[in-house]
Amino acid sequence: MEEVSVTADDFSANGYEVYFALGTFIEAGSREQTNVEQMRSLYLDIDYGPHHGGLVQYETLEEALGALKTFCKDIGLPKPYIVSTGGGIHTYWPLDKPLDKEEWYPLAYQLKNLCIEHHLYIDTKVTADCARILRVPGTYNQKTDEKREVKLFYAGTAPGSVEFFKEKLGEPIDRKSTRLNSSHT
């Protein structure tokens, strides 16, 4: 892991955006959903502030964190890992075992559905995208002229069991019958 961290730091110091994949892949070189083998977390992307072209609902980090806290309390989810990206937050609930993507999809879609139902304003394209890449803590978000540090904001709870998340998220929905792919306002 130390070697990966040093490499990420080097790329970031040289002006590159640095990301990591959330899934494992069957074959190297293809970051397509069809090439994803397993997933080991549920996650959200919540934007705030002025860097998003007026498409966000939260003005400040504090407002976004407050909405996330309310959502977790209402659903009964544990405190997630939270990474501050300099213009949003990425949240992670690690799972106690890897899931094949077809096992993971219903949980991810149900999490997305609950966010919408409970008015937690997320980037809905992210939550159920098994080929998604997100920012690496310890690097910099360099999308704008202002370099913003990507950092671990809160270390969440230990990995949760898949059974726990199935219970808390409720009956999984069929991803093929649901089209929730655009951000809602």
What residue ranges belong to the model's regions?
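Signature for HUH/AEP ssDNA processing cores
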Residues: 1-87, 94-110
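Alpha-helix initiation and N-capping motif
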Residues: 4, 65, 130-133, 162
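Helical (often loop-to-helix) elements that flank the catalytic cores of nucleotide-handling enzymes
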Residues: 53-74, 95-122, 142-173
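Short, glycine/acidic-rich hinge or "gate" loops at secondary-structure transitions
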Residues: 83-87, 123-128
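Flexible loop/turn segments at secondary-structure boundaries
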Residues: 89-90, 143
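A glycine-rich phosphate-binding loop feature that marks nucleotide/adenosyl-phosphate handling sites
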Residues: 126-139
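Charge-rich interaction segments
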Residues: 173-179
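Single conserved hydrophobic/aromatic residue that forms the stacking wall/gate
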Residues: 180-185
